[in-house]
Curated annotation (Swiss-Prot):
One GO CC term, this protein: extracellular region
UniProt keyword Amino-acid biosynthesis, yes or no: no
Family: Belongs to the arthropod phospholipase D family. Class II subfamily.
Compartment(s): Secreted
CDD domains tied to this protein: GDPD_like_SMaseD_PLD
Signal peptide, first to last residue: 1-35
Principal location listed in the UniProt entry: secreted
Reaction(s) this enzyme catalyzes, per UniProt: an N-(acyl)-sphingosylphosphocholine = an N-(acyl)-sphingosyl-1,3-cyclic phosphate + choline; an N-(acyl)-sphingosylphosphoethanolamine = an N-(acyl)-sphingosyl-1,3-cyclic phosphate + ethanolamine; a 1-acyl-sn-glycero-3-phosphocholine = a 1-acyl-sn-glycero-2,3-cyclic phosphate + choline; a 1-acyl-sn-glycero-3-phosphoethanolamine = a 1-acyl-sn-glycero-2,3-cyclic phosphate + ethanolamine
Protein name per its UniProtKB record: Dermonecrotic toxin Hl-PLD1
GO biological process: killing of cells of another organism; lipid catabolic process
Cofactor: Mg(2+)
Free-text comment on the cofactor: Binds 1 Mg(2+) ion per subunit.
Length: 324
């Protein structure tokens, strides 16, 4: 029992209250530390809302629990980015024709991801741009890389006000599209934003090509970090998990693929498929129903959680026990 040697009862009470408060705060801090430690052991998951191409859809998907969004970027024949637009055909049960001008879309993204904005959404941490460039000539792909770099610099990283805090994954279908990457990287370097790009920009080749071929393409480009790898198919069809599991194994191994940091699956709408993908070891999923993935993560709350802004999308997190 604590003893008080102050002359007044009031002084003694103050001391006892202070001691009690210190004990309470210390206890809370210990419990929070334990809680944080337990949270750190859970795999952070990127819940990526699919085909969010109209400005009005952005907050709709965020309100459903998405912490990341995917938008399609369509170009003219010369490589100028025009619209966030998918077109037909697209996933089952979706409107394929929603769109916005790319410039206007990115302006809205900045409003939602700049901490000083009245519209700031703390939980919105990543934007994936699905670049529709495969039918372009190499010259047009190069133009597309420069134009996208200019738009990101102008709309998200420069000008008055705070810059956007979110991360960006630039996704394109095939290794033959890498002229875009060369041009993008050269452009951000020439504009003085190379360090910002290294911090904020990642890459994904999404066309289900051979994983070794994809890894070699990155090595040829000199990309040694910030790589995501996807596997998937439209929600209208089913697909084996063999290639997905192979990608997860390569992520888990620094020797196999050092630059590969995250693996995600697309497009996943059934809760049963979401559960299977989590068991395989993915870091994220593209879904038309982010609220369903939130529900699944609640079931997996002992081992998984939604990623937040403190989680780096460029950090490799191997599984504790590998099945490779």
């Amino acid at each position: 029992m604590a003893h008080c040697y102050y002359n007044s009862k009031r002084g003694c009470n103050r001391v006892m209250k202070t001691v009690a408060l210190v004990v309470l705060i210390s206890t809370v801090m210990v419990e929070e530390s334990r809680g944080d430690s337990q949270e750190d052991k859970k795999r952070p998951i990127w819940n990526i809302g699919h085909m969010v191409n109209a400005v009005k859809q952005i907050e709709e998907f965020l309100d459903l629990g998405a912490n990341a969004l995917e938008a399609d970027v369509t170009f003219d024949d010369n490589g100028n980015p025009k619209w966030t637009y998918h077109g037909t055909p697209c996933d089952c049960f979706r409107d394929c024709l929603r769109w916005e001008y790319v410039d206007e879309y990115l302006k809205r993204i900045r409003e939602l991801t700049s901490p000083g904005s009245s519209k700031f959404r703390k939980g919105f941490i990543l934007l994936m741009l699905d670049l529709k460039i495969s039918k372009l000539s190499d010259n047009a792909k190069s133009k597309a890389g420069k134009e996208i770099a200019d738009m990101i610099i102008k709309r998200l990283w420069s000008g008055s006000g705070e810059k956007a805090q979110l991360y960006i994954v630039l996704s394109f279908p095939y290794v033959n599209d890498i002229e875009f990457v060369r041009a993008f990287r050269e452009r951000v370097k020439s504009k003085g934003f190379a360090s910002e790009a290294e911090k904020r920009i990642g890459w994904d080749i999404s066309g289900n090509e051979d994983l070794g071929k994809i890894r070699d393409a990155y090595q040829k480009l000199g990309i040694t970090d910030n790589v995501w790898q996807s596997d998937g198919i439209t929600n209208c069809l089913t697909r084996s998990h063999d290639r997905l599991a192979e990608a997860v194994c390569k992520r888990d191994s620094d020797k196999e693929w050092p630059s590969l940091k995250k693996v995600y699956y697309w497009t996943v709408d059934k809760q049963s498929s979401m559960k299977e993908a989590l068991k395989v070891g993915v870091d994220g999923m593209i879904t038309n129903d982010p609220d369903d993935l939130v529900a699944v993560l609640n079931e997996f709350s002992g081992t998984h959680r939604l990623a937040n802004i403190n989680d780096s999308p460029w950090q490799k997190i191997p599984r504790p026990k590998s099945n490779c």
